[in-house]
């Protein structure tokens, strides 16, 4: 019996020892939890500042944490809440991570304030992105940009325009693509998916009547107010002094939170270290407070290409890259190069990507030109109504195709024969469609300048030009010009078209590598182009008359020249700033990569340009329905039409004159006469020597800035090993100006 009692006492002592050890373990565990909970109190609001933190918990955990934020939003609710039981805490879901807001033995007072939330995506917010964006910007129009991929796995692209920027989203369905576009638009000016999360991130619950979806100006004093420590509440009087100090320190970080939101105002410029090579930092020093907006973010990770945009001095610059950081750098570099002529070391100049032209807009430009051609050729014979190459220049206000207007139209594929050269400027040397369209566009520009000669104010207000205070004229805001060509321009752009390599593949690739990017010349009285030969840059008059082949530069090279010098030419440079193309639309034989390389990238070595001149990089696009190839010989004539002119002019491409033998309205002689009538009566950008120049060549050389930029371009071609720009005999420009 004694042994039984002894064993009972021994087992009782062992049991009591185990209980004591268990209590000590629980006590130590409770202390560790207290420390972790206090630390998380201050770190939780700043978790969103770390870009590397991602949330991988399931939907149950997400909903539990969201409910937890709502429960802990009001401090008064925390004080009146009974502490959770230990069994419930142990039996709860492991993903809940619920912290005890009250501590036993402390009079039921608040020990610590725990702010815990998950980084909600737009798709799980109380209001999805479409609803939020509709409330902020009602009446937005979503349009389907494209549909790519196989039939069983399509990829849709939907775009929406918000605040002057176009955001494009992609997805396996139109609904998801539309949702993605709305998310990108919201992220450009909203940081948090809902009001609750925004308030909690800034240290307080939402005030009464605050609507996060209303205009920003409606709640500057509630949502974005300065966060001061609140007055002590009765329920917090018994809190520990250390907790109050920690809470005060957390509130002291309010400015960091405001900067993270980036909604209160522009961020201060970050000082760059000497020799800073980061274009984003340098641009921020020059223009503080810039915001970068993500315009496109593909859904497929293996083909990521982000597009970021930044607005500087009222102009929008865009860049693309495999990450948002690289895209921001490209956009910043584009702004630095365009506005400040700054080229950062280690950054390829001019490769910042612009937003692709909407396919619907490109198709509308093509349809406008082809429809206008059918309209103006209805009274012509079938022989004159056909064309092998068609070109036109369309004027728009912004990228609104509804207000588009065709201002110049032409056709043709031939050049003048050398025996028909004129030393009085009475012939048109190059009758290719693109070149004739540009000369018809000069006719249109002269008409617009002549409106400023009228004494009636309404006439000058109808002009596309406005007068500058410092002298001269410039285009009105949002006036854009677009070139449409039915086939890829002759020269290097057409040579490397993927549809034209039909011979042996190995020899074709070798030819491509050898002559890639070279300047090319047209064949006299024929079609096609050949690379420039020899270092000679000037042809001789007597040599051409004796049978030497007349050399004319290709259309590809001429368009590349327009992208630096402008469409207006030397004479009009006396009056107007350079006029550049906004876009080029090609109907067939089109390859965007090759076209971009020969149109823009060959000019990267030109260097810094004078004010108002730039390296223009027009938007490039094909059309949805490419024009069919037209076999047979090209017509031996060229047609041109200009808005405001009732008659349609037909030029014999071999002689460079009208069919009746008279000079064309687009020849040097006629256009220079219009210039002479304007000179001295209109304000000029160049210093006037007094008297009107007597000769055509003197008038052209008088545009000193234009001539210096032209020489700069020609030297860049030579330095890059692309060949020498061949000029016509100088005798062609040595004729007297007539009024």
Swiss-Prot record:
Residues 1-36, 53-105 are annotated as: Disordered. The active site is at residue 434. The keyword Cytoplasm does not apply. One of its GO terms (molecular function) is RNA binding. It is an enzyme of class 3 (hydrolase). Brain specific. Expressed at higher levels in astrocytomas as compared to the normal brain tissue. The keyword Flavoprotein does not apply. InterPro entries: A_deamin, ADAR3_DSRM_1, dsRBD_dom. Residues 20-34 have a biased composition (Basic residues). Pfam families: A_deamin, dsrm. One of its GO terms (cellular component) is nucleolus. It is found in: Nucleus. Its EC number is 3.5.-.-. Residues 408-735 form the A to I editase domain. Zn(2+) binds at residues 432, 490, 555. Residues 23-35 are annotated as: R-domain (ssRNA-binding). Keywords: Hydrolase, Metal-binding, mRNA processing, Nucleus, Repeat, RNA-binding, Zinc. This is Double-stranded RNA-specific editase B2. It comes from Homo sapiens. Residues 125-191, 274-341 form the DRBM domain. GO terms for biological process: adenosine to inosine editing; mRNA processing; RNA processing. Lacks editing activity. It prevents the binding of other ADAR enzymes to targets in vitro, and decreases the efficiency of these enzymes. Capable of binding to dsRNA but also to ssRNA. The gene is ADARB2. It comes from the Eukaryota.
């Amino acid at each position: 019996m004694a042994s039984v009692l002894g064993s009972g006492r021994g087992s009782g002592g062992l049991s009591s020892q185990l209980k004591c050890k268990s209590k000590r373990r629980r006590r130590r565990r409770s202390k560790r939890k207290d420390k972790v909970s206090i630390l998380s109190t201050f770190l939780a609001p700043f978790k969103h500042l770390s870009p590397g933190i991602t949330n991988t918990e399931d939907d149950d955990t997400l909903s539990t944490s969201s409910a937890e934020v709502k429960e802990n939003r009001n401090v008064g609710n925390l004080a009146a809440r009974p502490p959770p039981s230990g069994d419930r805490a142990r039996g709860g879901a492991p993903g809940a991570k619920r912290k005890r807001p009250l501590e036993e033995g402390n009079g039921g007072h608040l020990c610590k304030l725990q702010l815990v939330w998950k980084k909600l995506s737009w798709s799980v917010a109380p209001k999805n992105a479409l609803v939020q964006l509709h409330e902020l910007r009602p009446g937005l129009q979503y349009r389907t940009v494209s549909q790519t991929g196989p039939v069983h796995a399509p990829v849709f692209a939907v775009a929406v325009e918000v605040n002057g920027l176009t955001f494009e989203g992609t997805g396996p369905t139109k609904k998801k693509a539309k949702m993605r576009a709305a998310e990108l638009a919201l992220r450009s000016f909203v940081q948090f998916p809902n009001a609750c999360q925004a308030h909690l991130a800034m240290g307080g619950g939402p005030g009464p009547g605050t609507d996060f979806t209303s205009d920003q100006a409606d709640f500057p004093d509630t949502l974005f107010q300065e966060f001061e420590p609140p007055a002590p509440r009765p329920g917090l009087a018994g809190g520990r002094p250390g907790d109050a100090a920690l809470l005060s320190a957390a509130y002291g970080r309010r400015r960091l939170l405001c900067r993270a939101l980036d909604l209160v105002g522009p961020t201060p410029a970050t000082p760059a270290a000497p020799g800073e090579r980061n274009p984003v930092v340098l641009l921020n020093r020059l223009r503080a407070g810039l915001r970068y907006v993500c315009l496109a973010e593909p859904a497929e990770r293996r083909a990521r290409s982000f597009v970021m945009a930044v607005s500087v001095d009222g102009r929008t610059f865009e860049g693309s890259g495999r990450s948002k950081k690289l895209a921001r750098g490209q956009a910043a570099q584009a702004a630095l190069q365009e506005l400040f002529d700054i080229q950062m070391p280690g950054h390829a100049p001019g490769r910042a990507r612009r937003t692709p032209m909407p396919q619907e807009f490109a198709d509308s430009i093509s349809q406008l030109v082809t429809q206008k051609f059918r309209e103006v050729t209805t009274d012509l014979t079938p022989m004159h109504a056909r064309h092998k190459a068609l070109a036109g220049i369309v004027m728009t206000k912004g990228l609104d195709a509804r207000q588009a207007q065709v201002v110049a139209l032409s056709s043709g594929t031939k050049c003048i024969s050398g025996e028909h050269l004129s030393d009085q400027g009475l012939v048109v040397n190059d009758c290719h469609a693109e070149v004739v369209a540009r000369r018809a566009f000069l006719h249109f520009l002269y008409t617009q300048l002549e409106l400023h000669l009228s004494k009636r104010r309404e006439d000058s207000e109808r002009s596309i030009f406005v007068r500058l205070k410092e002298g001269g004229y410039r285009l009105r805001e949002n006036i854009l010009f677009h070139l449409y060509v039915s086939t890829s321009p002759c020269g290097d752009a057409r040579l490397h078209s993927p549809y034209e390599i039909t011979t042996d593949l190995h020899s074709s690739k070798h030819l491509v590598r050898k002559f890639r990017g070279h300047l090319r010349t047209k064949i006299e009285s024929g079609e096609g182009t050949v690379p420039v030969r020899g270092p000679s840059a000037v042809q001789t008059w007597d040599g051409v008359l004796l049978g030497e082949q007349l050399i004319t530069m290709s259309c590809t090279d001429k368009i590349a020249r327009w992208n630096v010098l402008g469409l207006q030419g030397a004479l009009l440079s006396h009056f107007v700033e350079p006029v550049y193309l906004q876009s080029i639309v090609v109907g067939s034989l089109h390859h965007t990569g090759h076209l971009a390389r020969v149109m823009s990238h060959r000019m990267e070595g030109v260097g810094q340009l004078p004010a108002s001149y730039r390296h223009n990089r027009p938007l490039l696009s094909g059309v949805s329905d490419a024009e069919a190839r037209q076999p047979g010989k090209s017509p031996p004539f060229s047609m041109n039409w200009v808005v405001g002119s009732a008659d349609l002019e037909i030029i014999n491409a071999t002689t460079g004159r009208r069919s009746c033998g008279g000079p064309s309205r687009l020849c040097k002689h006629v256009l220079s006469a219009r210039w002479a009538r304007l000179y001295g009566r209109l304000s000029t950008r160049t210093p006037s020597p007094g008297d009107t120049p007597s000769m055509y060549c003197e008038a052209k050389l008088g545009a000193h800035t234009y001539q210096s930029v032209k020489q700069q371009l020609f030297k860049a071609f030579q330095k890059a090993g692309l060949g020498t720009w061949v000029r016509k005999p100088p005798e062609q420009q040595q004729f007297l100006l007539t009024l």
